[in-house]
Amino acid sequence: MEKIHTKADYLDSLKNRNLTIYLMGELVEDPLTHPIIKPSIEAMAETYALAEREPELASAISPYTNEPINRFLHIAENNQDLYLQNQMQRKLGQLTGTCFQRCVGMDAFNALHSVTYEIDEKYKTDYHKKFISFLTKMHESNLVIGGAMTDVKGDRSKPPHQQADQDLYLRVVKRDKKGVYVSGAKAHQTGCLNSHWMVVMPTLRLTEEDKDYAIVGALPIESDGITYIYGRQSCDTRSMEPGEYDVGNKYFAGQEAMVIFDNVFIPNEYIFMNGEYDFAAMLVERFTCYHRRSYVCKAGVGDVMIGAAATIAEYNGVENKSHIREKLVEMNKLNETIYATGIASSLQGKETKSGNFINCLLYTSPSPRDDATSRMPSSA
């Protein structure tokens, strides 16, 4: 694939793909034009548009190709990189008012950078080298990588190998000289249809009996054996009704889907964990550390919510009423708490053994993961 430079390039890259997608029980022929799916594509495309308009914020120089790439593809080489990721995330939240779907992939490969290195250190494998080779390939074309961690899980009191249905967690069902075959499902996968590649990862701490579930690998989203079940959200169908009013966020939307894997092949060159169950928890913990901090994007969405609430108050002539002003102030306090703790976490990051930087876990815990935007006063 030719390198993606612009929003238009990105939209062109999504054309003529062979994907099996079901939405409300029907097969989707063209996700690019479907009224429910299209706004989510526009939100993802905004990550490229921002890099065009503000390259110093939304792009970086690849350490592997020495060429500009989207910042969502960049490995954090210092605390400033972590900080700029947050600045970009808040800006995109302001621009789209929704999820722009690239944070999971960014946080996944930043976590994998150090975890693959430490697996190699213990087991003398070559995962880190293969991972860097894969990442270089992604940088050369400036692609979107999605992260797939959340399994369906089933009975939460039992580990994967004790589930009544073994497909409730993604697992290796066959190995050969060329790679592995996986089956199972990943739930609530953000922006998966709008990505070019996905990286599958375990979702929890594993034991030796769960070795087949300790798999990390990259694969194109068009891989044979994958089916996507699109997860519709409240009021989605309004976009399919005539007219332009009362559709909520008119231009942008988030996207989640269940991804079903039926004997899907992952070649050896794209496998970055294969049975090293004792590193599953490390990967989940490091991914979670990055991802909690990434909820700074919600501060950008919160800015939109606060602005909308203030505008509604003004339209109704109550913008100066004390109880309205009090609620708007409270919304701002909660929103800036999200931002402040995320930024504090990024600026106090530390270098890992592999040389990239991970943010401070302490400041992620009370921050965006608290999802303060969900507690903003609804009566404002």
Predicted feature locations:
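FAD-binding core of flavoproteins
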Residues: 152-297
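Short, surface-exposed, low-complexity cationic segments
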Residues: 32-50, 193-202
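N-terminal-proximal low-complexity accessory segments that begin disordered
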Residues: 2-45
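Hydrophobic alpha-helical segments, chiefly the membrane-spanning helices
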Residues: 376-380
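Conserved small/polar residues in nucleotide/adenosyl-binding loops
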Residues: 363-368
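Gly/Pro-rich turn-and-neighbor structural signature
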Residues: 117-181
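Extended amphipathic alpha-helical segments enriched in small hydrophobics
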Residues: 294-352
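Internal helix-loop-helix
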Residues: 49-145
